[in-house]
Swiss-Prot record:
Function text: Usually encoded in the trnK tRNA gene intron. Probably assists in splicing its own and other chloroplast group II introns.
Name of the protein this chain belongs to: Maturase K
Family: Belongs to the intron maturase 2 family. MatK subfamily.
One Gene Ontology term, aspect cellular component: chloroplast
Compartmental location: Plastid, Chloroplast
One protein family per Pfam: MatK_N
Biological process terms in GO annotation: mRNA processing; RNA splicing; tRNA processing
Gene name of the encoded protein: matK
GO molecular function term, any single one: RNA binding
InterPro entries: Domain_X, Maturase_MatK, Maturase_MatK_N
UniProt keyword terms in alphabetical order: Chloroplast, mRNA processing, Plastid, RNA-binding, tRNA processing
Lineage: superkingdom: Eukaryota
Amino acid sequence: MAKFEGYSEKQKSHQQYFVYPLLFQEYIYAFAHDYVLNGSEPVEIFGCNTKKFSSLLVKRLIIRMYQQNFWINSVNHPNQDRLLDHSNHFYSEFYSQILSEGFAIVVEIPFSLGQLSCPEEKEIPKFQNLRSIHSIFPFLEDKFLHLHYLSHIEIPYPIHFEILVQLLEYRIQDVPSLHLLRFFLNYYSNWNSLITSMKSIFLLKKENKRLSRFLYNSYVSEYEFFLLFLRKQSSCLRLTSSRTFLERIHFSRKMEHFGVMYPGFFRKTIWFFMDPLMHYVRYQRKVILASKGTLLLKKKWKSYLVNFSQYFFSFWTQPQRIRLNQLTNSCFDFLGYRSNVPINTFLVRNQMLENFILIDTRMKKFDTTAPGTPLIGSLAKAQFCTGSGHPISKPIWTDLSDWDILDRFGRICRNLFHYHSGSSKKQTLYRLKYILRLSCARTLARKHKSTVRTFMQRLGSVFLEEFFTEEEQVFSLMFAKTTHFSFHGSHSERIWYLDIIRIDDLVNPLTLN
């Protein structure tokens, strides 16, 4: 316990931040509006034009916030469907959204200041390529070949919203901000039942995605903080310096409560999980723990994680959410790829001194493929095909111009090929390409009230083929002088791009299931 208190003491912040007064500054809401416009996922305010920022409405909001009965009416009428202005639906929803977006920016300020003041950050080199999602797979390919067991973990969520508020108390000490956060959570819990009757936050409305992400990141960082501490204590090697997202000042007090609920659990933890070859990878709620240890050790980790969630977060974790598998006998889905380590090894021949010395080495292979059935299911959900993969037209796009229709279908196809370029088997991608191409042709034929055959004869299939294979032709020119590279002739080349920083829209639902 003393070691943990010392570790927790290093992480805590001695400076208090009072951010509530910033909510009365007009520029905060201008920043929130700019984030909505420049973000990768735009937000619509109930059909109104988000490109217009009304400073007059913001000034009215600030004036209302100075009034004494501003929050009292809302608190005394929690079952009302509208906030701030019950007589006008537009103003009510505009005020609630712009206020929640501004609040999300304000509460992020202490964490940003803490990162800027961290002396260790200057010693850590900045590698922009590490932001890429594809940078995870070379790491898996390098490390997982030597490991034995794999644990699939789903981080328990939702949890009681009061726990989320308590997590922020370690960095935000002004009481009004915490009460305002409670107000938002209660407000959205009564609006369309976005939070369950048990008052556990699951998903905020998409209009408040920034606040939802901030709360979720705070929760996940707390979840990972203790795992990082155990990893440092159980490892025989010094870990690379890393900084957690959330610092805390009363973390040891929670651990004392944790120890009372489960006597002796913490004291045995250090030697209980000694494993110098433990690797941890997470994206969103999906977590992978890989180890070279025994099956008994992995079962101990599973037991620990279940009890940790129950006694520390007051959340019951279903044991079936943590699955144990042997790497050589199973495959796992991660970031839209289906990965496994086949039992059969492949031969690598090395030659030295002009073929005088030949060395044959048997090596394992980390195989990654694009899952066909889930991707076809995503296309079916987006109404590009049926559940069995039969292409259909896209009626809602028939009002667009021919070029816009071709551009949308072509962009979707290129994005799929680009994201799944690391797949060792391209047959699935070519099937998806066929579905999108025929769906595009049927959409254009439906727009012009013609048959697909008649439309294709008039337009010609060459244009569609060149449109969809533009990226393939570029790669064939790039690799023409060095290797016999062809998307159509080979299905085993894998390319990991370091410019992909977000999951494709059709792939993202697969990562949440």
